[in-house]
């Protein structure tokens, strides 16, 4: 069985269907009464159209990237960065020539294969973000959230798993096994997707298509609860307007997910949306507005106060601390621009200096 992508009529979002859904017209949307269903399937399904010289394009790509990398796909620098909570995250940064080759692979997947991630995926997708994911739950006026993390997501995506998943996705299912495995050689490190490679995000979003689709389809089958599902890389968020049996949902996900993708149970959270951060620090307040939350904004106010106070006393923060502060403020401006502008203006007026100068 393989999965295809179609664009929803008069919309920019996309959905996945398996081939049997397409044949039998089981589309997860309401069709207009004036639209003939078979016409809709044959004209709106986006990717089953033949892709001219697909295999040839991959052969040419492999020739180029082998030359660029001297046929050496194992050129990485390893370093660790602290996680937001505790512990460290392993990052593998490819050498410049390998990174350039991987960007060619990403471009080939986007422009030649044209496989769109499921509309539930919000990480590493143009015009999608943690904010757009949160807006999906906001639009549903969800009051109860289930947050699930997948354990060691990128390292768990082994070469065989990635290969078998891509063979279920159009048009990768049309490629020869040898050429597809050869392509993956330049995307893997120690037989897994390395976090830090340009290719890893688009590959994970692609291989998760069947699972994103299956989760959405299963959740839609429950009559008693209307669920909303989004995924941000390895963070799965399921919400509803009413309290639901989250243990049953977790059990279903454990049955659906493959053996190599394990749920990190110690990080599973369930509760009401009020007063808790659910998606990369974002939350829905009692008025159903997206916010960073009172505690995070309190920390930001203290940070800006300390920054400007030090600056007026000729104490300059380190480049690392200034970069960290810039990132925090940029995220606040993205999520709550009015609050950002009001807060920064208040402290600039208090100290008589600009935050921009203090962060130079």
Question: Which residues does each predicted region cover?
Answer:
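Short acidic donor-binding/metal-coordinating loop in glycosyltransferase active sites
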Residues: 150, 233-234
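Active-site-adjacent structural elements in folded domains
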Residues: 223-224
